[in-house]
């Protein structure tokens, strides 16, 4: 095996660290954190954020997987950039209900490996909680600490009644198992959760975009 091959192959990052995982599938365990961040940006905007502005922002991964898969293949490359932000959520690798179970578990593992790796390098990491169908509850909360802050996304789950029901079922199971102190909520908050005192809504990008467009249109009309 050539030296160049050894240098480029990532061995699923096992060459960097093998964490003593928890649960049936050995999921790396995260340290509990509390996050006071109010301004969140997608990872796709992180590089363009001015260095001096980064401590006022936190990074989420509620975007398409292809935009952050490179974090898994080259985790060390992005450590300096991510270290500049107030908080960084664990990557939201997809857990679609029609994905094979093996892929769902693999994505949960990758999320936790990266989160733990970032914590080991001094980054404040808040856990992104995600689930699939009810049978995923037996492993999708493995590695998540109890009683701390978490972040979830409802984007793409509320228009279809069946998807909305799956989301609510998983959310209630998350509350039961993890007892989060605060839930940073990205996207529309279902009516049944709006009264929860620990729910902290964060407008999804499309909502912010609509506000910006409306503000620009209003400013343009005022100039006329």
Q: Predicted segment positions?
A:
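N-terminal accessory interaction module
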Residues: 32-50
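Eukaryote-skewed repeat-based solenoidal scaffolds used as protein-protein interaction platforms
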Residues: 47-52, 63, 71-214
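An active-site-proximal beta-strand-loop segment
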Residues: 68
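Compositionally biased, intrinsically disordered low-complexity regions
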Residues: 23-28, 44, 50, 189
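A short, charged/proline- and glycine-enriched loop
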Residues: 54-56
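C-terminal accessory extensions appended to soluble enzyme cores
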Residues: 1-33, 197-224
